[in-house]
């Protein structure tokens, strides 16, 4: 690795996986100058330090040495169909996928993938994270360090996901999505996105086993927010009783909550504007729809 010198700063850029401790360093300077500390005595090259260079005539100048740890990027889509492929990709310590990340396969005889925890190095996926039918994990552990993504897709409106063991949808570090979340799976029970504040696209869930749906800091959904609990018989299901998205202020499209059989209350305490409201198929036992701050509905209200 070669360092760059700009003004009085010496900067070396290395992949975040590389340690420079005890590195062999080659440096050149005029033999009449002195450097304090002597670089030959330094072993900890991973940390910032200052070197004082004194020329033969007594002029002194200080240089700050800095290390920049760069991300490891993968260009294009990454498709992981087997446990071996997951392990091989994880070994690269990639932090950024510049494309879609596709986990599993929809093929009938595809190998089951039960563990993606080795993908913990990932911090960003610019495209969609797609979970296919052969993923057999109970949650998305391994994607917990992803801060931003283009979208998250589990199944679709045409074909529901058959990931039979997937009970929890959660990504602990996720803060922003530039696209959609779409989850169509009968086994998903718990949904939790602790840090997700902005979704530029839509939120689409159809989960007939739903018990909990938590977005504690979500403020903005750019398009529709649609939550459903239809089961395979096309009837209302789910055991969630109370729905609250406490910080939500804006939904660009329609806010729709329907076909949740046990729902008794829903609260959107800070919602000010939405493109529409659709609560046309709610259970008889629903007691409360709380929208105390609503000011603007740009479309229809259906109840």
Residue ranges and their predicted role:
Residues 1-80, 88-89, 95-99:
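Beta-rich interaction/scaffold domains
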Residues 74-84, 97-114, 118, 124-244, ...:
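Concave beta-strand-loop units of leucine-rich repeat
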């Amino acid at each position: 690795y070669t360092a760059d010198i700009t003004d009085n700063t010496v900067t070396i850029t290395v992949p975040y996986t590389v340690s420079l401790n005890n590195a062999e360093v080659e440096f050149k300077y005029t033999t009449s100058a002195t450097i304090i500390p002597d670089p030959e005595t330094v072993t900890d090259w991973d940390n910032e330090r200052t070197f004082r260079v004194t020329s033969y005539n007594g002029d002194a100048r200080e240089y700050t040495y800095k290390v920049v740890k760069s991300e490891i990027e993968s260009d294009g889509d990454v498709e992981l169909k087997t446990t071996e492929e997951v392990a091989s990709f994880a070994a690269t310590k990639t932090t950024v996928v510049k494309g879609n990340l596709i986990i599993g396969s929809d093929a009938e005889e595809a190998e089951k993938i039960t563990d993606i925890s080795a993908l913990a190095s990932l911090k960003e996926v610019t495209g969609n994270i797609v979970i296919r039918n052969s993923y057999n994990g109970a949650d998305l552990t391994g994607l917990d360090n992803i801060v931003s993504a283009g979208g998250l897709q589990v199944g679709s409106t045409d074909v529901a996901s058959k990931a039979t063991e997937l009970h929890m949808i959660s990504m602990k570090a996720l803060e922003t999505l530039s696209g959609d979340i779409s989850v169509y799976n009968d086994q998903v029970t718990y949904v939790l996105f602790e840090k997700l504040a902005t979704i530029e696209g839509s939120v689409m869930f159809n989960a007939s086993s739903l018990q909990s749906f938590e977005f504690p800091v979500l403020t903005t959904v750019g398009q529709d927010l649609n939550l459903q609990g239809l089961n395979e018989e096309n009837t209302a299901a789910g055991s969630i009783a109370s729905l609250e998205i406490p910080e939500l202020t804006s939904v660009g499209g329609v806010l729709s909550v329907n076909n949740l059989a046990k729902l008794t209350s829903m609260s959107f305490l800070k919602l000010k504007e939405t493109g529409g409201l659709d609560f046309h198929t709610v259970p008889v036992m629903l007691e409360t729809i709380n929208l105390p701050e609503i000011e603007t509905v740009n479309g229809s209200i259906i109840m």
